[in-house]
Amino acid sequence: MLYYLIALFIIIADQLTKWLVVSHMELGQSIPVIDQVLYITSHRNTGAAWGILAGQMWFFYVITIAVIIGIVYYIQRYAKGQMLLGISLGLMLGGAAGNFIDRAARQEVVDFIHVIIVDYHYPIFNIADSSLCVGVILLFIHMLFDSGKKKEQ
């Protein structure tokens, strides 16, 4: 249940922040948070990261539904007693669902977190994207420790 609450928290935070951006900012408007480093920039993306597969909504619908079903299956089947695995899956579920809601409702994803590292403008992203990335990193860490435990046995 905890893992689904994590996913729900991510979905609510993601959708609330996207609603604030859409409601209070013009497309392309940028607000500095830390000048030359972090901005809130109103952006839309019809594809994946870096605009890959722009406009291929049916592809994203099918893949995302399959991923969500897979994550729910793994939570139900394997997450009991595996806190790190469950948290990682909850984060990925929330992230996948957050961006799916955008694609289904708007046919695009609202992005707004704009990071500049030296002179490189990292692709603008959102809370769902961040949640997916952190979830994948935690899953990788879980897999490293889990495979180490299996080798010891």
Curated annotation (Swiss-Prot):
PANTHER family: LIPOPROTEIN SIGNAL PEPTIDASE
Claim: Manganese is one of the keywords in the record: no
Name by which UniProt lists this protein: Lipoprotein signal peptidase
Top-rank EC class of the record's enzyme: hydrolase
Record flagged with keyword Protease: yes
Record's bilayer topology term: Multi-pass membrane protein
Catalytic residues in the record: D111, D129
Record-level GO cellular component terms: plasma membrane
Source organism per UniProt: Bacillus velezensis (strain DSM 23117 / BGSC 10A6 / LMG 26770 / FZB42)
The organism's place on the tree of life at top rank: Bacteria
